Amino acid sequence: MKTLATIGDNCVDIYPQLNKAFSGGNAVNVAVYCTRYGIQPGCITWVGDDDYGTKLKQDLARMGVDISHVHTKHGVTAQTQVELHDNDRVFGDYTEGVMADFALSEEDYAWLAQYDIVHAAIWGHAEDAFPQLHAAGKLTAFDFSDKWDSPLWQTLVPHLDFAFASAPQEDETLRLKMKAIVARGAGTVIVTLGENGSIAWDGAQFWRQAPEPVTVIDTMGAGDSFIAGFLCGWSAGMTLPQAIAQGTACAAKTIQYHGAW
């Protein structure tokens, strides 16, 4: 099985209604979910020298993630206020903290050389690394979330093997966007559709996957777990539809409890 590292965002998700805080963020979540499939991933991110930063590093280590490049910086760890409305998470105030200045060092790049797959997301300030990583032969994946107006759709996709995004539902406008993304150089684009499943375009055909019927407790981490399940499936040699099915199953597991993991 191939090796995987994530780079970029982390945050502590604070649930005032539950009086609890959970470690999270796309790069952190994807790394943790990959451990479900026997992968020991690495993660490059920045945390503050506060209690939340200590918590996040301890949580990652406990879950089996290599935290040697989770760097502690002076300041506060990124934080997101989260409310639950009918078991769906609604994001409130966000404090970016030390992540506002995140950038990879030359030593970080050297450390990434050992990994086959590198993933990041649109919040992680990691997009500048992808041309170099892709040119070095890494399999690259990037999550655009629902930011369809981002200029990165024009500049970043030629350096991506997998472009992930989210949308409410499938329609002709979405399908045309997906075709254009692959035409600009992305290998495959995969869009999660919440309760409507997911759709992928690989340049030859569309692939659709229905969601698994489960009782939803909290949708936090659903998209991140889909990405992790998919990438682990692909790294193990699964076909595209098989990897999508594994991503769907991983997301179904995650949404049945509070917090990302």
Curated annotation (Swiss-Prot):
It holds the Pfam family PfkB. It comes from the Bacteria. Keywords: ATP-binding, Kinase, Nucleotide-binding, Transferase. SUPFAM superfamilies: Ribokinase-like. Its EC number is 2.7.1.218. Belongs to the carbohydrate kinase PfkB family. This is Fructoselysine 6-kinase. It comes from Escherichia coli (strain K12).
